[in-house]
Amino acid sequence: MVVGTKKYSNLDFVPTISDSEDDVPILDSSDDEKVEAKKTTKKRKGKNNKKKVSEGDNLDEDVHEDLDAGFKFDLDADDTTSNFQGWNFLAEGESNKDDAEAFVKKDVDLDKIIRRKGGLVKMAHIDSKQEEETEKEKVEKENDSDDEELAMDGFGMGAPMNNGDENQSEEEEEEEEEEEEEEEEEEEEQEEMTLEKGGKDDEIDEEDDSEEAKADFYAPETEGDEAKKQMYENFNSLSLSRPVLKGLASLGYVKPSPIQSATIPIALLGKDIIAGAVTGSGKTAAFMIPIIERLLYKPAKIASTRVIVLLPTRELAIQVADVGKQIARFVSGITFGLAVGGLNLRQQEQMLKSRPDIVIATPGRFIDHIRNSASFNVDSVEILVMDEADRMLEEGFQDELNEIMGLLPSNRQNLLFSATMNSKIKSLVSLSLKKPVRIMIDPPKKAATKLTQEFVRIRKRDHLKPALLFNLIRKLDPTGQKRIVVFVARKETAHRLRIIMGLLGMSVGELHGSLTQEQRLDSVNKFKNLEVPVLICTDLASRGLDIPKIEVVINYDMPKSYEIYLHRVGRTARAGREGRSVTFVGESSQDRSIVRAAIKSVEENKSLTQGKALGRNVDWVQIEETNKLVESMNDTIEDILVEEKEEKEILRAEMQLRKGENMLKHKKEIQARPRRTWFQSESDKKNSKVLGALSRNKKVTNSKKRKREEAKADGNGARSYRKTKTDRIADQERTFKKQKSTNSNKKKGFKSRR
């Protein structure tokens, strides 16, 4: 360029927008379009603008009339964070409340029935001595006697834990102690056994893989070790693109977590990964960030599905989809698809026709779309992600997983993530992994570092558990401002507890498989927004769900294994926050072994964690009073269940009527639709379920039992069961009789000799 005025010919700097307009050099090669644009804008401003320009001669030269005086450049735009309120649990088409209401099918309003019966009006009030204490005494009592630190034996081997137990008769205590002593030897052996795929045998099973087999299957251990040593101060040091960094900054992500620091660089190289870390450590972002970064360099004009993310539950799939959208919000051209059961099939088909870059799905609906949705195929898939991979590898998903592996291209990248990852080679062979890098950040089967684990010993008071739950929630959250998750074993229990709590004046939600998908999402969203502070759910919600600020997890029923326990309590104390879990412990050996495993984990990781394992004391006298109130409501509870069932039958009949009308009205259109197919016949499904049930119920024998069984098979007549108290008494009597007869025979022989 040639500068038109000599005044600017030798300048070492370029004049900026803040310099006086009179001093701006006139360039010979000026842009005519820009000049015309300037003129048109000046004309629009009219006479008032001319006055301002004339007055501008008297103003400071550094001030321009078209600029905001308070404007500043934000140099740290990538470090700004919005007030993130957690992930959205809304399916496609549910972006606002009106759409959601139109989308949700009509169903029975249980809260309305409970209100008609006198519930959900006022919190039940139970008189007790505890409520008469002053605030100071309450605090002292909570600090001094609510919690007792548990030793490795758990609950002090049957020592009384509270004043309520003193009223128990000595005879009952002696019987319980005798039972505990009888079970003690059995429990020691059961520590070496698997409790329905849980416990310590998983570690033993992993050792069954020989060193040569591991060397052939996995990448060299040095790769994983080096990855774990890498710690990055911020995401910029990971060499990520600016749009991805901007998306992370908008979520408040500042420093990569250990699992993210270890896995992101390796995932960007295209290598297979098997990764494990504690719950709430950022595993979803650990695989979503490298995926989005790699998709930035995809061919822009070719629409194809390149990434498949498989998850075990629908709610988790919806959450992961939202995580991906939030991270990629500033990345242009990346599309997401959701394929989960329970939601509108036609909407999903239309969305998958556009071949989104990333499809997040549950296995069953994913196979359904591959087989029956036009224009959707997986021929160009480059990355397969399995979140909660240990659950996906279990028997319930085995058939679907084998079908999916046969449909996907073999030359893909595989990323497997879980908090309780089982990296046994036998279970991973079917996934066609290529020298996967194994990255286990935390010790296996470890709870969150700031989790306080409390245990309440129920003994033989199972009938008091609903009253105990009510009293515990009221004590932990008297104002209803904390989020509390309650885990139960059965769907029926969750539903009944919701009715009981409602009649006692406590608003709670429920989440389990008997609800429709719309009801499930509605329950999660109400809980997230604190419309209901308590959510009673089955293990459906134990994995992956990341709802912010869940302060307490209550295990109303003990889980089947320690792994499931870890996933349950992992709903709280996430991402470095503090949390508390309270578990109701029965007298079964399975319950007590889980408690021992939890205490042992805390003891072994004392130097690495701030967590505690405590025994919680409760006022059983007050709980007895609450239970009397609950028992007085039994007839009302049954009436509510009957009324709800009747309303459901009416709604079902109306639905069948509408279905019949549609069949008549749109008969030709419905008959013209191609029949949907599945990879299994009905008989295959039944056989698969039977085989799965048999494999789950098969007991794993330890070395001692296996030797006894082998000896019995050889004809040595070894006992196949452990001696009971009755057997021991009978043995003692037989031994005594033998000794008596031997002594009498000796005396007779001595007399005959004489």
Curated annotation (Swiss-Prot):
Chain ranges of the Helicase ATP-binding domain: 264-439
Keyword Nucleus included in the entry's annotation: yes
Its principal location? nucleus
Report motif location: Q motif: 233-261
What residue spans carry the region label Disordered? 1-61, 119-227, 675-754
Annotated catalysed reactions? ATP + H2O = ADP + phosphate + H(+)
| Role played | ATP-binding RNA helicase involved in ribosome assembly.
Q: Tell me the protein's name.
A: ATP-dependent RNA helicase DRS1
- Say which species the protein is native to: Saccharomyces cerevisiae (strain YJM789)
Give the classification, highest ranks: Eukaryota, Fungi, Dikarya, Ascomycota, Saccharomycotina
